[in-house]
């Protein structure tokens, strides 16, 4: 969103918001907070949010076995595996306004320790993102000049979450795994 500034001769402006939610299915919970302080020429804003959930439950049993293929790991018959997630997002912005000129900088950070997908082969087991956005906007007699520069770094790790296994073909594990090895396609060697 665009930065907010106080009106002329208003002095300063401060506002904020806080929110939270809880959903029993999956024990999902989250919250958000935002705050802004501004004068006629400077605006400082922060926004942050967090969300997390365990696997959610279906309306009734839809599987015939609790086996996941991972030794020692099972799921209830009504639990939809690989639907858990956890995320945190933060953004801090500062803007300066003088006459017909605006300079704005925003830094953001996102952390997702895990996001599991029931319809995908692999899960995201770690994700980190940092971003920096710079913006200038100036109105001149000949027109408007707007310039932006940004940098974004993302690093993530994909692998199989606890509800998935590497091999799903014949002899791929479960209660009838050959040699007792849940991920063995054929044998221990």
Q: What do these predicted regions represent?
A:
Residues 2-3, 37, 138:
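Active-site beta-strand termini and strand-to-loop segments that position acidic
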Residues 4-7, 52, 152-153:
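Active-site/binding-pocket entry motifs
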Residues 6, 23-25, 139:
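Short polar/acidic secondary-structure junctions
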Residues 13-19, 23, 27-30, 34-127:
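Periplasmic-side early beta-strands and strand-to-turn transitions of outer-membrane beta-barrels
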Residues 76-189:
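Outer-membrane beta-barrel domain signature, strongest for Gram-negative TonB-dependent receptors
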């Amino acid at each position: 969103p665009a930065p907010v500034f106080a009106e002329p001769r208003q002095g300063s402006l401060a506002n904020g918001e806080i929110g939270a939610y809880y959903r029993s299915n999956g024990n999902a919970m989250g919250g958000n907070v935002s705050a802004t302080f501004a004068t006629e020429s400077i605006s400082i804003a922060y926004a942050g949010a967090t969300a997390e959930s365990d696997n959610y439950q279906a309306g009734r049993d839809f599987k015939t076995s609790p086996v996941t293929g991972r030794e020692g790991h099972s799921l209830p018959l009504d639990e939809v595996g690989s639907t858990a997630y956890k995320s945190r997002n933060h953004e801090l912005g500062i803007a300066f306004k003088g006459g017909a000129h605006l300079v704005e900088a925003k830094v953001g950070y996102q952390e997702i320790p895990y996001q599991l997908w029931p319809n995908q082969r692999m899960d995201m087991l770690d994700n980190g993102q940092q971003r920096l956005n710079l913006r200038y906007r100036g109105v001149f007699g000949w027109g408007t000049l707007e310039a932006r520069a940004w940098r974004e770094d993302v690093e993530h790790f994909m692998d199989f979450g606890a509800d998935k296994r590497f091999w799903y073909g014949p002899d791929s594990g479960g209660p009838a795994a050959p040699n007792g090895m849940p991920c063995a396609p054929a044998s221990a060697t």
